[in-house]
């Protein structure tokens, strides 16, 4: 009998950023204006020198401008913009250089703290540089000495932006045109971590010295209930608590509140900075040891080790009057304090699935908030 072999998973496919889409479409539109050449595909050079060809959905003259569009292909990454139509409209200007405008579906910056000034279209520096380099090279090749007005838009971008961090960052009216390498890596954490850093930067630049970093919607609701904290000071960290703690070394605040589900906080207590199940797991034997430190007898400790979930362990401790939630938060607090600067006051909240506080540490509040 032939021995069975496990089927190897197909490699995940990379995609291209909205910045690459904007570069390709602006180049095609400018070429049409300057040479009359209508393209159905265009080749661009990414920041690290790789050449890629991108297919266009359209490339046409309209009155005194040209426009081109392409469908964003994020590869196998679950990107909110995958399949969206990214388009550029280019007009020629007398003055040399490139001027950027936010079109329909692209946001504008309304708060200080980002790399772009207030009032600027949300087209990030690397995409701006990519477009500028391609357009100036085209102008040189064709002997054109004037400049370009480049309007970038994303069809349906205003609605898509509501699924991103843009509204909280003060980027209103649509999406951001992003990318540092020009390539979307499947399931890369880089973009999410960047949004966490931006959230902290925006909050501190706008004068907020107390921020609350939360793992999800329920923990955000808890922080609103406890502190009436505004959205600008709520940092949606998801599983990336390490991104918050490490960034505070560069941008310290006066006070940091960490809030998450009990299971997530127990991982932080064990020293994990990525709380996703792919990278860290709940240590039930460790929970049993912490329960012992707060009065759990041998039988309860064994039942914790044998529990199916951390929530089950927490419930057993609650029945026995053992404050496991507070003990876990104390260990999470100690770990967080070991990462951030000493001047940052840290507190930790653990919540249940209903948003009730089941543990807290470093908190100058009474239990009335639970």
From Swiss-Prot:
GO terms for molecular function: cobalt-precorrin-5B C1-methyltransferase activity. The keyword DNA damage does not apply. Keywords: Cobalamin biosynthesis, Methyltransferase, S-adenosyl-L-methionine, Transferase. Its EC number is 2.1.1.195. Belongs to the CbiD family. NCBIfam families: cbiD, PRK00075.1-1. This is Cobalt-precorrin-5B C(1)-methyltransferase. It comes from Pseudomonas savastanoi pv. phaseolicola (strain 1448A / Race 6) (Pseudomonas syringae pv. phaseolicola (strain 1448A / Race 6)). The gene is cbiD.
């Amino acid at each position: 009998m032939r021995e069975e072999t496990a089927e190897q998973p197909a490699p995940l496919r990379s995609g291209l950023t909205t910045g690459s889409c904007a570069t390709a479409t602006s180049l095609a539109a400018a070429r049409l204006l300057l040479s009359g050449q209508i393209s159905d595909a265009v080749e661009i050079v990414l920041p690290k020198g790789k050449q890629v060809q991108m297919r266009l959905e359209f490339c046409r003259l309209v009155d005194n401008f040209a426009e081109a569009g392409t469908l964003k292909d994020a590869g196998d990454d679950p990107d909110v913009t995958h399949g969206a139509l990214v388009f550029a409209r280019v007009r020629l200007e007398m003055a040399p250089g490139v001027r950027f405008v936010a079109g329909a579906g692209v946001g504008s910056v309304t708060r200080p703290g980002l790399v772009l000034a207030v009032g600027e279209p949300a087209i990030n520096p690397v995409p701006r540089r990519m477009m500028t380099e391609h357009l100036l090279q085209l102008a040189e090749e064709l002997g054109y000495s004037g400049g370009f007005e480049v309007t970038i838009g994303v069809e349906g971008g205003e609605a898509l932006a509501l699924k991103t961090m843009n509204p909280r960052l003060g980027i209103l009216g649509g999406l951001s045109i992003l990318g540092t390498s020009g390539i979307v890596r499947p399931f890369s954490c880089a973009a999410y971590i960047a949004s966490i850093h931006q959230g902290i930067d925006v909050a501190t630049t706008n004068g907020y010295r107390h921020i609350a970093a939360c793992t999800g919607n329920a923990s955000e609701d808890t922080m609103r209930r406890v502190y009436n904290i505004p959205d600008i000071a709520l940092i949606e960290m998801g599983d990336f608590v390490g991104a918050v703690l490490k960034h505070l070394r560069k941008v310290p605040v006066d006070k940091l509140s960490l809030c998450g589900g009990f299971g997530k906080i127990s991982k932080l207590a064990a020293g994990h900075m990525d709380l996703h199940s792919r990278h860290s797991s709940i240590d039930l034997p460790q929970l049993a040891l912490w329960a012992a430190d707060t009065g759990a007898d041998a039988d309860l400790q064994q039942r914790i080790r044998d529990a199916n979930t951390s929530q089950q362990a927490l419930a057993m401790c609650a029945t026995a009057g053992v404050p496991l939630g507070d003990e876990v938060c104390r260990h999470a607090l100690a770990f967080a304090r070991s990462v951030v600067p000493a001047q940052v006051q840290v507190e930790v909240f653990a919540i249940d699935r209903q948003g009730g506080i089941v543990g807290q540490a470093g908190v100058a509040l009474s239990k009335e908030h639970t």
